[in-house]
Swiss-Prot record:
It comes from the Bacteria. It comes from Clostridium novyi (strain NT). This is Large ribosomal subunit protein uL29. CDD domains: Ribosomal_L29_HIP. The keyword Transferase does not apply. One of its GO terms (biological process) is translation. Keywords: Ribonucleoprotein, Ribosomal protein.
Length: 70
C-alpha cells in the first residue's frame, strides 16, 4: 500500500478495517491455492497481500491502544 492509502485506512472505523482484513485474508487464501495448483501468475502478489494484512492489523492495534488510553 502507498502512504496515501494508509492514511485513508487510518480514517476508517474498526469495523471497516476488520472487513478489509477479512477480504485480504480471503485473497491470500485464494493466492495460496493458486500457487499450490500452479495457476498463480504473479507470485509477488502474495507478499503484497501479506504486507497489507500486517498494515491493517497494525492500524487496528493502534486504535485499540488509543481506546485503552482514554
Amino acid at each position: 500500500m502507498r502512504a496515501n492509502e494508509l492514511q485513508e485506512l487510518r480514517v476508517n472505523t474498526a469495523q471497516e478495517l476488520s472487513a478489509k482484513l477479512n477480504d485480504l485474508k480471503a485473497e491470500l487464501f485464494n493466492l495460496r491455492f493458486q500457487l499450490a495448483t500452479g495457476q498463480l501468475e504473479n507470485p509477488m502478489r502474495i507478499r503484497q497481500v501479506k504486507k497489507s494484512i500486517a498494515q491493517v492489523k497494525t492500524i487496528l492495534r493502534e486504535k485499540e491502544l488509543k481506546v485503552i488510553e482514554q
